[in-house]
UniProtKB/Swiss-Prot annotation:
It comes from Desulforamulus reducens (strain ATCC BAA-1160 / DSM 100696 / MI-1) (Desulfotomaculum reducens). The chain crosses the membrane at residues 5-25, 52-72, 81-101, 116-136, 148-168, 181-200, 230-250, 256-276, 309-329. Its cofactor is Mg(2+). One of its GO terms (molecular function) is metal ion binding. Catalyzes the initial step of the lipid cycle reactions in the biosynthesis of the cell wall peptidoglycan: transfers peptidoglycan precursor phospho-MurNAc-pentapeptide from UDP-MurNAc-pentapeptide onto the lipid carrier undecaprenyl phosphate, yielding undecaprenyl-pyrophosphoryl-MurNAc-pentapeptide, known as lipid I. Pfam families: Glycos_transf_4. This is Phospho-N-acetylmuramoyl-pentapeptide-transferase. Pathway: Cell wall biogenesis; peptidoglycan biosynthesis. The gene is mraY.
């Protein structure tokens, strides 16, 4: 099978994102779309105040262009690719509205929690319905690290689990996006793992979209690595989470997402544990949550935290990939 088109998708998204940087970043600066830094955060972060945000629009355009160019033909997995692309852009739109309200309308909290969750639920519902009734995905789940053992939950449990997967992943990536290059770099590994799973199951169209996510994140890293010239904002983090969650649902690897996206799980758990501990005992388990801030306040430099968390994301993705039955079936047929 010729995978050239998948590499091309990553390349197009990478180049579009890279080219948009010198145009988008000065525009965001002129519009004064600057990031507000929490006073209770690490003191070193105060220097980031005013750094342009909403930069996620750069790689969203790159992903959309790659998808528009390469998903026109009737390739295997085209429908799956279009669905994941739609969810990615939909979640990006929710993030954009949230950023716009915070940065432009100066409403610090952005969209109300119920408004943001409602928007995410709408796209998650569409994904669940389309996956089962249009893509023939079924309502069964493959148990990771097994010989392909699966179990069928039926429609309603599948529906609610899909909602949970999309909301959990998008907000997990959002929580991870707290250091220069952390979320964009970690997503390179996570999205690569799901792109490989799409390829080995013959879903080239889906692999194209996920490869475009990888390319867009790599292009964005040129401007987002420390010291960051731009932040992705909720525009980018919610979109990336939507892409990963939707990719997991379409490839029937929702359970494996817990492993492949293990870094996001750790970041989210650190927040949950911190809140529960403080409310029940008045004590904090971590110096600060999410987890990356704990290591910063423990004396690690921002670069060191990011490098180690990238490595952790790579290892989670590798272990998760090795736990996928589809991957081993593909290897055995080579």
């Amino acid at each position: 099978m010729d995978y050239t088109v998948v590499w091309l998708a990553a390349g197009i998204s990478f180049l579009v994102t890279l080219v948009l940087g010198p145009v988008t970043i000065p525009l965001l600066q002129r519009l004064k779309f600057g990031q507000t830094i929490r006073a209770e955060g690490p003191a070193a972060h105060m220097a980031k105040t005013g750094t342009p945000t909403m930069g996620g629009i750069m790689f969203l355009i790159g992903i959309a262009v790659a998808g528009a160019v390469l998903l026109v033909s009737n390739i295997p997995g085209r429908a799956e690719g279009l669905v994941v692309l739609a969810v990615t852009l939909g979640y990006g739109l929710i993030g954009f509205l949230d950023d716009f309200i915070k940065v432009v309308l100066k409403r610090n909290l952005g969209l109300k929690a119920r408004e943001k969750i409602l928007g995410q639920l709408v796209f998650a519902t569409v994904l669940a319905v389309v996956a089962v009734f249009k893509l023939g995905r079924g309502t069964d789940y493959i148990i990771p690290f097994s010989s392909g053992i699966s179990f069928d939950l039926g429609w309603w449990p599948f529906f609610f689990l899909t909602l949970f997967v999309l909301l959990g992943t998008s907000n997990g990536v959002n929580l991870t996006d707290g250091l220069d290059g952390l979320a964009s770099g970690a997503t390179v590994f996570t999205a690569t793992a799901f792109a490989i799973l799409a390829l080995v199951t013959g879903k080239i169209g889906l692999a194209i979209v996920l490869a475009a996510v990888v390319g867009g994140c790599l292009g964005f890293l040129f401007y987002n690595r420390h010291p960051a010239k731009v932040f992705m904002g909720d525009t980018g983090s919610l979109a990336l989470g939507g892409a990963l969650g939707a990719g997991a649902v379409v490839t029937r690897n929702e359970l494996l997402l817990v492993v492949i996206g293990g870094l996001y799980v750790l970041e989210t758990l650190s927040v949950i544990i911190q809140v529960i501990s403080f409310k029940t005992t008045g004590r904090r388990v971590f110096r600060m949550s999410p987890l990356h801030h704990h290591f910063e306040l423990s004396g690690w430099s921002e670069r060191k935290v990011v490098r180690n968390f990238w490595l952790l994301s790579f290892l989670f993705s590798l272990v998760g990939l090795l736990g996928a039955q589809d991957f081993w079936l593909w290897l055995s047929n080579r």
